[in-house]
Structure formats: structure tokens, C-alpha cells
């Protein structure tokens, strides 16, 4: 029997929090070593893509450095479909992981690219996540 890992405080499985649906193509960058365990159980037919591109439904990007995040956001904005979801995760302050990113930093970098944030969640005890989508008028 598969064990369901509950992420954060809600008791909701992480894959559901992130909106991963059956048949989705997902690209993950910089995830912690136990990410596969955190996502379990995955919906049927989920495929992990090596690269972010027009065929990807959801990207989960983990970042600790503002400069790296700025570059990746700009690159992803060009590569992804307008209806793809982009989750950006950063270390929570209480985690003591060195970072130059906060929730406000993500907004500061993403909003000028045409993204808007629509959801926030705890990924695990270290990482928080902010869901970004392209503004409706730009889709």
C-alpha cells in the first residue's frame, strides 16, 4: 500500500495542493532529494519532463538566490504555454536555509513578466510555494 505524505499543515497531499492532475506533464527544477516522496501518491499518467517547454502543464521551481530566480522566471515565461502553472518555492525563514528570496521577492520579479500569484502553500518544513499564472488578459 502506498503511503501518502501530508505536506505542510493542511493534511492535503502535495500533488493535490499543487494542482497536478492525471496525465499532466510536470517539470521540476532544484527540488529537495525527498521530492518524489513528498509528491506521492501521484495521479495516474503524470509524466516528468526533462525540460520546460510548450508541452509542460506545470513547473515547480525551487530557488534560493534572487539572481538565479530572475533568470529562470524570464526563461520560463518565454518557454511555457500561457495556461501553464508555475510554482516557485523558496526556503521558509524558520528553516535557517540561506536565501535571498522571500514571497515578496517572487512577486517583484514575476509581476513585470505578466504573472500573477494566485495561491500559496507549504511544501514541507523547509519550503513554501507560490503559484504563478499568466494574467488572464495576456493569455
Where are the predicted features?
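N-terminal, charge-rich interaction modules
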Residues: 1-37
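Mature catalytic domains of secreted/periplasmic carbohydrate-active enzymes
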Residues: 38-42
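Short acidic low-complexity segments
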Residues: 45-56
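Short, glycine-rich nucleotide/cofactor-binding loops
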Residues: 59-69
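A short glycine-rich, Lys/Arg-flanked "PGG" loop and its adjoining helix->strand segment in the class I
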Residues: 70-82
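Conserved beta-strand signature within the Rossmann-like core of class I S-adenosyl-L-methionine
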Residues: 82-92
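Conserved class I S-adenosyl-L-methionine
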Residues: 94-105
Amino acid at each position: 500500500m502506498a503511503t501518502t505524505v501530508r505536506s505542510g499543515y493542511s493534511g492535503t497531499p502535495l500533488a493535490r495542493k499543487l494542482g497536478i492532475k492525471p496525465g499532466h506533464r510536470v517539470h521540476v527544477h532544484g527540488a529537495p532529494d525527498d521530492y518524489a516522496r513528498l509528491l506521492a501518491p501521484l495521479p495516474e499518467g503524470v509524466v516528468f519532463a526533462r525540460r520546460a517547454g510548450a508541452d509542460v502543464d506545470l513547473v515547480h521551481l525551487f530557488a534560493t538566490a534572487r539572481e538565479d530566480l530572475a533568470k529562470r522566471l524570464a526563461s520560463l515565461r518565454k518557454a511555457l504555454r500561457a495556461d501553464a502553472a508555475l510554482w516557485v518555492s523558496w526556503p521558509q525563514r524558520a528553516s535557517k536555509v540561506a536565501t535571498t528570496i522571500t514571497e515578496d521577492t517572487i512577486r517583484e520579479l514575476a509581476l513585470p513578466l505578466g504573472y500573477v500569484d494566485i495561491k500559496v502553500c507549504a511544501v514541507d518544513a523547509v519550503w513554501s510555494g507560490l503559484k504563478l499564472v499568466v494574467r488572464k488578459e495576456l493569455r
